[in-house]
A protein has these predicted regions:
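Generic N-terminal targeting/processing segments that precede catalytic cores or assembly contacts
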Residues: 2-96
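Generic hydrophobic, helix-prone segments enriched in Leu/Val/Ile
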Residues: 19-24, 137, 155-158
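A structural-propensity feature for long, helix-poor, extended segments
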Residues: 142-158
Length: 169
């Protein structure tokens, strides 16, 4: 059974739209306040090494990454290609922030969602909803993610947090 389409009457977004939405989501997260202990536009939270300015420098450095990930996903890029794009984006983020990790998790997870969104646009010609994104992520890069997760979690035995968990949600 195919997941339901979201807003089927709307014009389809482009990979650029997906990338801009990801960047805007990070800005919206920064703008959300109050967030005890976390950086906002008006507060450093519990961080003495980062503030809204470092987050904005990071966002500026990452703004071209998310559309690239969506484009790569739309072209069926392999996991190593996505990983390379992510590592390059992480390096730009760290250079822009003086080595401060403001968005490493977003580079990885939001980047993969952008790639999945690009894949759905290319394959289904629809606005991707959560179920479509999950299915594309599992189908295209699930095995590579599972192997990466197994390698990363082997010392602490989190093997239950792998592909079966992602794909069964």
């Amino acid at each position: 059974m195919k997941p339901a389409l979201l807003h089927p009457a709307r014009a389809l977004p482009s990979t650029g739209h997906i990338g801009r939405a990801a960047t805007l989501a990070l800005y919206d997260e920064l703008s959300l306040t109050p967030k005890p202990g976390l950086v906002t536009l008006v507060d450093r939270g519990s961080h003495d090494d980062m503030d809204a300015h470092s987050f904005m420098r990071s966002l500026f450095a990452l703004r071209s990454y998310f559309p690239k990930m969506a484009q790569a996903g739309s072209q069926g890029a392999s996991f190593p290609v996505l990983e390379r794009l992510g590592i390059e984006a992480e390096q730009r983020m760290l250079a822009a922030t003086g080595g401060i990790n403001t968005h490493r998790g977003a580079v990885f997870m939001l980047g993969l969602l952008c790639a999945a969104g690009g894949a759905v646009l290319a394959e289904q010609a629809c606005i991707p909803g959560a179920a479509w994104l999950r299915e594309a992520l599992c189908r295209h890069w699930g095995e590579a993610l599972q192997q990466r997760s197994l390698r990363a979690s082997a010392p602490v035995s989190y093997t239950h947090l792998t592909l079966p968990t992602i794909c069964s949600v």
